[in-house]
Amino acid sequence: SSAASDVYKRQVKFYSALYNAHFLPRAFSDVDGSYPRFDGDGQIMKMDHGTYYCDFSQWDTYRAVHPLFSILTPSRNGDMAHSLVLKGQQGGWLPIFPSWNSYTAAMIGDHCIAMIGDAIVKDTPGFDYEEAYTLMRKNAFEANPDSGSYRDGKGRRAMESYLKYNYVPLEDQVTEAFHRREQVSRTLEYAYDDFVLAQVAKKLGKTDDYKACLLYT
C-alpha cells in the first residue's frame, strides 16, 4: 500500500541519517590502544582506557551529533571527550577545530567546550572533569601570547578584543584565522560557549568562574 511504502521510505531516511551521523569523529587508536600523539612528531601514545578519536568537525556537531551520542552511546561520547582532553594536554591548548590529529584555525567558535561541557553536565563517564575544566577555562580566559603557536590554531581568535569589550568589534580583522570577517558570529559563538562553561563551573562548585563566564553571555 502507499501508506506502507511511505513508512518504509521514512525508515530508510531515518536509518541512513543515523548511519551517516557516526562517520565522525573517527576512531584513531589501534586495538592495543596506541595512537599518534596529537600535534606531535610521530610519537606513539597509549590509551589507559577507551578509544582515541580524531577529526572533530565542530561546526554544528555539538548541537546535534554529540547530544545524540550522549543518549545512544554515552560511554563512546565520553571517550570522545577524553580524546579532546588528551589533545589539550599534549598540545597545551584545547583545540578549536581538531582535524588530521592536529590544530587548525578553521572555526569561529570554541565548540569543543560546548561538547565537553554537555558531557560533564550529563555526568558522562570516561574522562576527568577537573582536567577538562582546566583546559576549557584556559581557552575562555586567556589569549595565546605566542604568535607562532597562535597562528597554528592554539587559542581562540581575537581574544584580546573579546576579553576587553565582551565582543569582537568590526575593526578587529581577526588575523591569523581562516575566517577573518565574522565578528558578530564569532561573538555569538563565544558567548554560547561561555554560557556552557558557566554551567560546568556551577556544577563543579567554581562560583567565581561561573559569575565571570556569565558576564560574556
What are these regions (language model features)?
Residues 80, 210-213:
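Alpha-helical solenoid repeat scaffolds, predominantly canonical TPR units
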Residues 83-207:
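Active-site cavity-forming subdomains of large catalytic enzyme subunits
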Residues 16-30, 54, 60-77, 117-122, ...:
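Alpha-helical support elements that line or immediately flank enzyme active sites
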Residues 39-62:
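Short, conserved helix/loop micro-motifs enriched in His/Cys and acidic residues
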Residues 33-46, 75-99:
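Active-site-surrounding "flap" and adjacent substrate/cofactor-binding loops of secreted or lumenal enzymes
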Residues 12-16, 20-21, 25-46:
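Short, functional "switch" segments adjacent to catalytic/cofactor/reactive centers
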Residues 3-8:
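Short, small-residue-biased leader/transition segments that mark boundaries at the very start
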